Amino acid sequence: MNQNILSRNACNALRGLAIIGIFLHNYCHWLGPIVKENEYQFFQHNTDWLLQVMANPDINLPVHLLSFFGHYGVPVFLFLSAYGLVMKYEAKPHLSADQQAQMYNISGRKQSWSISWRKPLRFIRYHYLKLFKMMIVGFIAFTMIDYITPGSRHYEVLGIVSMLGMFNNVLPNPDNIIWPGPYWFFGLMLQLYIVYRLLLYRRHWGWTVGLMLLCIGIQLLLGFDNPESEAMNRYRYNFMGGMLPFGLGILYARYGEKILMTFHSPVTNIFGCVFCISLIYSLSLNMIGWTFVPFFICLLSVLVADLLQEVSWLSGIYKVLEWMGVISAALFVTHPITRKIFIPISRHGDIYAGLLLYIISSICLAWLFTQLMKKIPNPKY
């Protein structure tokens, strides 16, 4: 198995970078005149809109780019989550040498281990409670703020229960059920934890690659039929839409640079980053390329991590991103609160004033919630 290609500090820095993209995207894409993203479905008119904005840039260009590309922080989170699962549950000393050889050798034979349901259920319960601990503090605070501010949502019993149970992603019309919207991520992560423990945990690499190819293949079929369809929307709301970056995280933890190569040279890594960014932009302009963008997002992530650790004059940025990674969980659950409060400022014309207040208040509130969440006992495995 790969030994710590991504250090804990590097993982925190990448989480920080990912959450910056996510929480800025989740503000910018709510603004009417700003380019919309292709997160769950592929809308050609959104890419045409982006091309038009790039051809005629104005003062809002950074907001357009954050709105269109910021949601790709989610694949980075999925990649890091899978990487962390493998490093935690599959690294030595949990496995014997024979088990590791069978699992990680590229030419290894198929496993025939039987499944004991008690351990998987304990694993799923533990990770559900970890997600619940993270979600509940933000959900309670958000619903109270939502109720006392203009435009409050009409909540229904099924929506509340499915949110707390983290099965809202599988219900029809998830766009209308999940509120606040970013909380769809909790249902997605629970599904991926289940898939990992039942299908991929300590299994031959072929299981992971096979599931990735199956999910990508079905998505392409849906895309060829109608990339704007509700079927595509529901598909990508669930684990199938996140299987590519999640699977890459598993494989990268096991095989390292056989999966995603870094160059261990700052200059070469910079060129690699530029190459990835160019590919991400160009592939985002058509449905087939859009399907594979998360791969290059993950590659860009490991290149950035390597670059941040090797270039001394980037150490200040590295430390800031590390700290953002530490508060990323709290920032994820609290940014819908501050968005609801400050977005009217941007909608009424002063986009950057509202955005700046949102950034400052979100980071401060996330730090406070991080301290609060430390007081909540962790679930026992």
Question: Can you describe what each PLM-predicted range is?
Answer:
Residues 219-330, 337-358:
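Alpha-helical transmembrane segments and terminal signal-anchor/GPI-anchor hydrophobic tails
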Residues 1-216, 347-381:
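Membrane-cytosol interface segments of multi-pass membrane proteins
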